[in-house]
Amino acid sequence: MILQNALVYTPRHTFEHGTIVIRDGRIVPFAAPEEGEEVLDAEGLYALPGLVDIHFHGAMGKDFCDGTEEAIQTLADFEASKGVLAICPATMTYPEEFLNKVMDAAAAHKNGKGADLVGINMEGPFISPKKVGAQNPEYVQGADAAMFRRLQKRAGGLIKLVDVAPEEPGNLDFIRECHNEVRISIAHTCTDYDTAVKAFEAGATHMTHLYNAMPGITHRAPGPIIAAMEHDAEVELITDNVHIHPAVVRFTFNTFGDDRVCLIADSAMSCGLPDGQYSLGGQAITVKGPRATLTEHPDTIAGSNTCLYDCMKRAVLEMNVPLESAVRAASETPAKSIGVDNDYGSLAAGRYGNVILADKELNIKAVIQKGVRII
């Protein structure tokens, strides 16, 4: 396939008029059309890399923790329809016996139709019982290296991120022991600045949904956010215009940079469906518009109801984040953060031919996956 006359988001993180050539599923340097090759005129359209979501839970009534092929395929199909072509869905806080079936289902899944399953984000259960958010406090436990390794074996090595509250007893030791086996993310935590620094020095490299379920910044208690800033950590950001004020979103891009900000959806099973009652992590949630909350605790946000593409779009159109930065934060940066950037997250030669064509209002006009138009 050849895409001509597009305004292409280049590996230099700028937009330039150009042509994208895709052969055998991957982007190649410019080449003349072959006989019978499909040529698509993208005049007036942006060509964006397929997005990479490293933290979401569900959509269309299915949750990754359903632990079934049907659920995974539903998520893969939905995400692909929204231009998200590589997914690393997140688990919730459950006991090992429950997580076993989730890992088994992920390991058995074969990529083909829909977004590629490229990893698993193990969001629980190694978190703080005081900062569970929408996680189930009943199953919170200390970080357990043997348990992680058993789950990783069942998952066939798919676990790319493990979330840890470093202040909990033994959790710093887990970071020291396991950081060379998996990326460690600071999450659902009450940690202070000094303990967060120890966590990053021990090998943590990532922070889960920045600002949410963690202490904030004050001038006498800088907390984990400043520690992350000082230690080159990559940070997740939910830009659904519910979780974080637009000014704080802009502040984060200005301080961390788009090479360290990973936009995420953190969406629940309600994403893509009407308002109503759903569940997340075994707890009832109520959805109204873009806002999802625990039904029994309506002041507690329970994931989002927005897909990653729409989070990126809102960051640009509602929060005044530059398009170039928002695109990078939804594609290349998350791909790098979990080590799949040789295949995903960029329109550089050698990467998969995953392309979104969008108009100037960022409405999706086409989605191309590995050189095949699927939307």
Question: Where do the model's predicted regions map?
Answer:
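His/Asp/Glu-enriched, well-ordered alpha-helical/loop segment
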Residues: 224-235, 253-265, 271-351, 355-357
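Alpha-helical scaffold segments that flank or form the walls of functional sites
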Residues: 46, 54, 64-116, 138-154, ...
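Histidine-rich, glycine-flanked metal-binding segment
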Residues: 1-48
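Active-site core of metal-dependent hydrolases
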Residues: 149, 153-274
